[in-house]
């Protein structure tokens, strides 16, 4: 019996209140998240939905306006009359030919649908166990001092035990003052980390890491320019602080390089950066074998993408989990995800268990397909 597939791509702009807007050294201020939702519905009953964020040019190097055509191009390359597992495998074979944000959109929807079809959570589909809640860090983006302090007090009051501070936006002296105030508010028991988003040269990193050592940081994320492994190694050899690679993990060659560096470094894995959940699982296995500690995290994204990342964290049990992406969003089109006691709380149910309201989105395209 032939199978027909309906593919629908939706868009929604998700907004934070002003105090929670994204502002990093790499991104600048982001007023809203430009979300995309791919919905796959087959005549055999298979159904899955996946979310990615389009306005991440500073990470993906793909203009926002090119994301929709990239997703459509990949969809038209695939044989949709094949079994979903075969489509997922074919999608992975295209990862070197199309932008990872496009493969992530398709793979996220397929993985969610496969878990739903099998009557299990995504965490179980990926080989782990589902949990109702997962501990997460929280993030203090660049903001005026009064906002920084107000949010620090709020996050600590909400029992977040891990706080990450975005630095390298203003002067380093301001960064030091903010960290001193946060440590004063948090005390010695709270984990504090910083993220420079690749803003420093090797020499600047060496000097500034030395100045940061007094704050007893859990790690410093992406201190040097992504892709400059010579600079990263110089920084790594200059400090006792753990250093984490994020933007610098752009492809398989970067994974190889960090595996060779080994346990003295940390890795930050993101679905949209690597191309989909299977790539995250594969990279996690490689880093575990190499002794590299891992954080599984995300871009700031809506609740559907955040829930998927959280289920990956459930399955893979990384050292750190960064799952604050949908915290505080005012108009998310996906419901079911909440935060309590420093944890992200997820609904039960097959797949992701969340509820997606396509009626609140803009329709980008809607196609019935057979095969390429």
Segments predicted by a language model, with ranges:
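Short, Gly/Pro- and small/polar-rich lid/capping loops
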Residues: 1-36
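N-terminal amphipathic alpha-helix/helix-capping segment at the start of soluble metabolic enzymes
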Residues: 2-10, 116, 120-132, 344
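Metal- or metallocofactor-binding catalytic centers and their adjacent structured scaffolds
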Residues: 3-11, 41-117
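Conserved, mostly hydrophobic/aromatic
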Residues: 38, 45, 106, 119, ...
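Metal-dependent enolase-superfamily TIM-barrel catalytic cores that perform enediolate-based chemistry
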Residues: 124-239
């Amino acid at each position: 019996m032939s199978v027909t597939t309906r593919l629908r791509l939706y868009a929604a702009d998700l907004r934070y209140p002003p105090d929670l807007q994204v502002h990093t050294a790499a991104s600048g201020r982001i007023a809203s998240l430009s979300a995309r939702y791919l919905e796959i519905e087959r005549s055999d009953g298979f159904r899955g939905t996946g979310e990615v964020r389009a306005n991440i040019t500073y990470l993906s190097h793909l203009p926002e306006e090119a994301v929709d055509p990239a997703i459509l191009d990949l969809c038209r390359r695939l044989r949709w009359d094949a079994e979903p597992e075969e489509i997922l495998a074919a999608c992975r074979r295209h990862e070197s030919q199309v932008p990872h944000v496009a493969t992530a959109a398709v793979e996220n929807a397929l993985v969610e649908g496969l878990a739903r079809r099998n009557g299990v959570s995504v965490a179980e589909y990926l080989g782990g166990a589902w949990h109702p809640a997962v501990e997460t860090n929280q993030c203090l983006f660049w903001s005026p001092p009064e906002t920084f302090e107000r949010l620090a007090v709020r996050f600590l009051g909400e029992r977040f035990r891990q706080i990450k501070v975005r630095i390298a936006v203003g002067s380093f002296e301001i960064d030091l003052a903010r960290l001193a105030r946060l440590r004063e508010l948090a005390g010695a028991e709270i984990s504090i980390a910083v993220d420079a988003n690749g803003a420093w040269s090797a020499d600047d990193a060496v000097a500034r890491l030395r100045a940061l050592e007094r704050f007893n940081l859990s790690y410093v994320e992406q201190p040097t320019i992504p892709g400059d492994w010579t600079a990263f190694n110089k920084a790594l050899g200059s400090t006792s602080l753990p250093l984490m690679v994020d933007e610098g993990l752009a492809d398989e060659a970067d994974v190889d390089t960090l595996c060779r560096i080994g346990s003295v470094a940390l890795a930050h894995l993101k679905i949209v950066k690597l191309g989909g959940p299977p790539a995250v699982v594969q990279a996690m296995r490689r880093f575990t074998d190499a002794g590299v500690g891992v954080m599984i995290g995300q871009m700031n994204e809506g609740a559907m993408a955040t829930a998927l990342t959280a289920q990956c964290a459930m399955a893979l049990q990384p050292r750190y989990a960064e799952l604050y992406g949908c915290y505080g969003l005012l108009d998310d089109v996906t419901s079911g995800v909440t935060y309590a006691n420093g944890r992200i709380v997820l609904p039960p149910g097959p797949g992701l268990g969340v509820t997606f309201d396509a009626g609140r989105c803009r329709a980008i395209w809607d196609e019935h397909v057979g095969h390429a």
